[in-house]
Regions:
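Conserved ABC ATPase "signature" region
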Residues: 119-137
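Q-loop/switch helix immediately C-terminal to the Walker
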Residues: 92, 98-113, 123
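Conserved ABC ATPase signature
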Residues: 141-146
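Conserved ABC transporter NBD signature motif
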Residues: 61-72
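Helix-to-loop junction immediately C-terminal to a conserved catalytic motif
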Residues: 53
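ABC ATPase NBD coupling module
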Residues: 70-87
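Hydrophobic anchor residue at the start of the ABC signature
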Residues: 155
């Protein structure tokens, strides 16, 4: 496995209309590593994802994905191609409520979803199983699915095209407390089997304990990312 960090952020600053700009002093994500970061609200989390993917550039600092700076990509076509390396699991991703869950899962593979081609249907079933979605949901309208199934649908679509880096925005925000740890286990299993690096922007400690190798908290005033203190009693 390469020793080049999957994601590296150094001295990053980006203003976005909040009381303070988004600052990240230093973050290095090893290949295959999973990290949670608490301390970013929904707007800051979206900005973080945009910075990592190069959709937005920082006013200061450097962001590198697999050794390459996002600032080095100046061509729109090249940038679009670079997005293949990212999977983004977010509630901002549109689910077609009137379509079946299978049709929603088929969309990353093409727009021909009525009917779903046999080969694509097989890939959809395998993807659902991998992400912890019971197969009986596939023929049901997506709008009828519970929050846990929808969260796993966002996860499944994010990994469908084999990205190298998975970004999750508050993935358990809509989940019942009883499902948060299991979702963390499901997401960790998916990342492990695919050798995915991942950053989850979440303050959910139960999810983080099941999902992450490291859990960090952003200090907004300085941009420091701190780990929980050890307790000796």
């Amino acid at each position: 496995m390469s020793s080049v960090p999957a994601l590296e952020m150094v001295g990053v600053l980006k203003r976005y209309g909040a009381l303070r700009p988004l600052r990240i002093q230093a973050l290095a994500l090893a290949p295959g590593e999973r990290v949670t970061i608490a301390g970013l609200d929904a707007i800051a989390a979206e900005l973080f994802v945009n910075l990592v993917t190069g959709a937005s550039l920082p006013e200061a600092g450097q962001i590198r994905n697999f050794g390459r700076s996002t600032a080095d990509i100046t061509d729109a076509e090249e940038w679009l191609g670079s997005l293949d390396r990212f999977g983004i699991a977010t509630d901002r991703g549109v689910l077609l409520e009137g379509a079946t869950l299978a049709q929603n899962l088929a969309l990353p593979f093409g727009l021909d979803i009525d009917p779903i081609p046999v080969e694509v249907g097989e890939r959809v079933a395998a993807l659902a199983t991998e992400c912890g979605i019971a197969l009986e949901w596939l023929d049901q309208p997506c709008g009828a699915a519970p929050a846990g199934v929808k969260a796993r649908t966002h996860l499944a679509r994010a990994v469908a095209l084999a990205p190298a880096l998975l970004l999750l925005e508050h993935p358990t925000a809509s989940l019942d407390a009883a499902d948060r740890q299991q979702f963390g286990r499901d997401a960790a299993r998916v990342c492990e089997s695919r050798s995915l690096s991942a950053v989850a922007l979440s303050a959910d400690a139960e999810f983080g304990a099941a999902f992450a190798h490291r859990s960090l908290t952003l200090v907004p005033a300085t941009g420091a990312l701190t780990a929980p203190r050890r307790r000796w009693w």
